[in-house]
Amino acid sequence: MGFSGSRAWSKWLTICLAITHPFSVTAKSAADYYVHSLPGQPEGPLLKMHAGHIEISPETSGNLFFWHFENRHIADKPRTVVWLNGGPGCSSEDGALMEIGPYRLIDKETLNYTEGSWDEFANLLFVDQPVGTGFSYGSTEHYVHELDEMASQFVTFLEKWFEIFPHYEPDDLYFAGESYAGQYIPYIARAVLDRNKKQDVQANNRIWNLKGLLIGNGWISPQHQYPAYLPYVYQEGVVQAGTQEANLIEAKAAKCMKELNVEDTTGTVHIPDCEDILQAILDYTHKGKRCINMYDIRLTDDYSACGMNWPPDLRDIQPYLRRKDVVKALHINEEKQTGWTECAGAVGSSLKARNSKPAVELLPGLLEEGLPILLFSGQKDLICNHVGTEDMIKNMKWSGGTGFELSPGVWAPRQDWTFEGEPAGIYQQARNLTYVLFYNASHMVPFDYPRRSRDMLDKFLGVDITHIGGDPADSRIDGEKGPTTSVGAHPNSTAAAEREKEKLNTAAWKAYYKSGEVALVIVAIAAFAWGIFIWRSRRKHQSSGYRSIYPMLGLNSTGSLGQISHKHSRRNGDIEAADFDETELDDQPSQAFLSRSSRDGDAYAVGEESSDEEDGASDGQQPMFDQSRGEEGRS
């Protein structure tokens, strides 16, 4: 080979190495995502977590952020619940740190365990999506505009996620979320079912076991939910009918209805004229500098936030997720140059879904394919209120019936639900669809009632703890118990561990107290006997002259008291130890459950923990940025 040929070969080899080098460097394994420590974590073993970015579109630098929590126990089979918040453009870290996740913030620095978190019997996967939401990032020019784009993007994410974490792919899979996720979830479910039908997926045995959907206070059917604003506020007494202000709201509602009756808009997700109804209601409630909270009508907020500052945990979440040590712990890419915000206005502005049909049109097909769906509503939410959801269900047709018809003209009953003796809500179900109304709950039901929402989840997933033990929750539908569920009272749950630890400490103190009482009695008896002995010795001394006061021991007085005192002390120690009944402690459960590795055991293991370790993260915060909740604000 001549010089020119050699140079060409060298150049070709250099190009090949340049092309292949990035792939060899950037390919990641599960160990790269392992969360070794979490700043502010509560005492006790760290829950098994993975977090970080997965690139879904190299050409647009599109990266989605995820935070995964492994289940604490497996009741009968492994399950994974994927949680999505709405907006559009609102981060699912809302769900992780304020709703269904295992931790909640006490302040900007400190996390605490949540009793009733959804990770007890299911793996939880929180995803900031679409691109641009929360910790996710990418080219702003390529933010998604339609719901089918969003679903395609999410399926790509799942494909890549399961390649890194293949041991979770066979799990029963559920999608859950709230608010605008009522649009996301049906579209994603449809995309997953269509994917499962592909020949290459079936040939490679990579079918995803989609088992159900859960949507809370979902924005699903604009055609039914926009008109529900007015009857809801009348029903709840927020607006007084017949007033001048009420007439103004009714005029806005009439204009919306006119738009909804136009054929071109019946299949539209976002209708600006209809958005004016909610704004008119908020203006009506404007008193001084306050207005009603659109997410919980029992509360007020600064005007014109009207709920954007709620829940109160928000003031701590943004500073916490912008701390440098937290950013490092969660493996946030350096390419993510802006700090975390709850809702990205640019994402919401882009995703208007002008050519997307509302998700309500997908629900009948999903139900008819045998996919169970649960819709739940908080009674005190205005923005995605239960009146609109119930009207949507009432008019929806699937599987040969309308709404909750069991047969023509016969409707499934609304069943009373009680939880631990208190009225909790209503259940209604037919033909794969379940509806749950939570009494006295807001837009974010798990924020208000984590234990009740977990009970609902366990019922829907079919979790039954009968064969693994635990204190069952007293949850009844029309007075009857269903499968035995445990909400924070499982013997290996974090909350139960704290209770058992307290029991153990109490038992120990009782045992010590009891042994102390016995020792006191022994000392009193010994003192009395000593007094009698001295008295008798002195009487002898008075009758026969001075002798040692320890005549029977054959000891002189020098140093003898110390020796007898020593013997008495040892004897007392033996009696005290003998009187300490160790069975009182043996009756209490072992502290072994306080260690995650020992409490889970092989029976509950899903995958293996990474052995990699990292140095502790450094403290500090990133600069603060403005926060928006998106235009719709349906987070």
UniProtKB/Swiss-Prot annotation:
<keyword id="KW-0645">Protease</keyword>
<dbReference type="GO" id="GO:0006915">
    <property type="term" value="P:apoptotic process"/>
</dbReference>
<feature type="compositionally biased region" description="Polar residues">
    <location>
        <begin position="483"/>
        <end position="495"/>
    </location>
</feature>
<feature type="active site">
    <location>
        <position position="381"/>
    </location>
</feature>
<keyword id="KW-0121">Carboxypeptidase</keyword>
<keyword id="KW-0812">Transmembrane</keyword>
<comment type="function">
    <text>Protease with a carboxypeptidase B-like function involved in the C-terminal processing of the lysine and arginine residues from protein precursors. Promotes cell fusion and is involved in the programmed cell death.</text>
</comment>
<feature type="glycosylation site" description="N-linked (GlcNAc...) asparagine">
    <location>
        <position position="112"/>
    </location>
</feature>
<dbReference type="InterPro" id="IPR001563">
    <property type="entry name" value="Peptidase_S10"/>
</dbReference>
<feature type="signal peptide">
    <location>
        <begin position="1"/>
        <end position="27"/>
    </location>
</feature>
<keyword id="KW-0378">Hydrolase</keyword>
<keyword id="KW-0472">Membrane</keyword>
<protein>
    <recommendedName>
        <fullName>Pheromone-processing carboxypeptidase KEX1</fullName>
        <ecNumber>3.4.16.6</ecNumber>
    </recommendedName>
</protein>
<dbReference type="GO" id="GO:0006508">
    <property type="term" value="P:proteolysis"/>
</dbReference>
<feature type="transmembrane region" description="Helical">
    <location>
        <begin position="515"/>
        <end position="535"/>
    </location>
</feature>
<feature type="topological domain" description="Lumenal">
    <location>
        <begin position="28"/>
        <end position="514"/>
    </location>
</feature>
<keyword id="KW-0732">Signal</keyword>
<feature type="glycosylation site" description="N-linked (GlcNAc...) asparagine">
    <location>
        <position position="432"/>
    </location>
</feature>
<keyword id="KW-0053">Apoptosis</keyword>
<comment type="similarity">
    <text>Belongs to the peptidase S10 family.</text>
</comment>
<feature type="glycosylation site" description="N-linked (GlcNAc...) asparagine">
    <location>
        <position position="440"/>
    </location>
</feature>
<feature type="active site">
    <location>
        <position position="179"/>
    </location>
</feature>
<feature type="glycosylation site" description="N-linked (GlcNAc...) asparagine">
    <location>
        <position position="492"/>
    </location>
</feature>
<dbReference type="GO" id="GO:0016020">
    <property type="term" value="C:membrane"/>
</dbReference>
<keyword id="KW-1133">Transmembrane helix</keyword>
<keyword id="KW-0325">Glycoprotein</keyword>
<feature type="region of interest" description="Disordered">
    <location>
        <begin position="579"/>
        <end position="635"/>
    </location>
</feature>
<keyword id="KW-0333">Golgi apparatus</keyword>
<dbReference type="InterPro" id="IPR029058">
    <property type="entry name" value="AB_hydrolase_fold"/>
</dbReference>
<dbReference type="GO" id="GO:0005802">
    <property type="term" value="C:trans-Golgi network"/>
</dbReference>
<feature type="topological domain" description="Cytoplasmic">
    <location>
        <begin position="536"/>
        <end position="635"/>
    </location>
</feature>
<dbReference type="Pfam" id="PF00450">
    <property type="entry name" value="Peptidase_S10"/>
</dbReference>
<feature type="active site">
    <location>
        <position position="443"/>
    </location>
</feature>
<feature type="region of interest" description="Disordered">
    <location>
        <begin position="472"/>
        <end position="500"/>
    </location>
</feature>
<dbReference type="GO" id="GO:0004185">
    <property type="term" value="F:serine-type carboxypeptidase activity"/>
</dbReference>
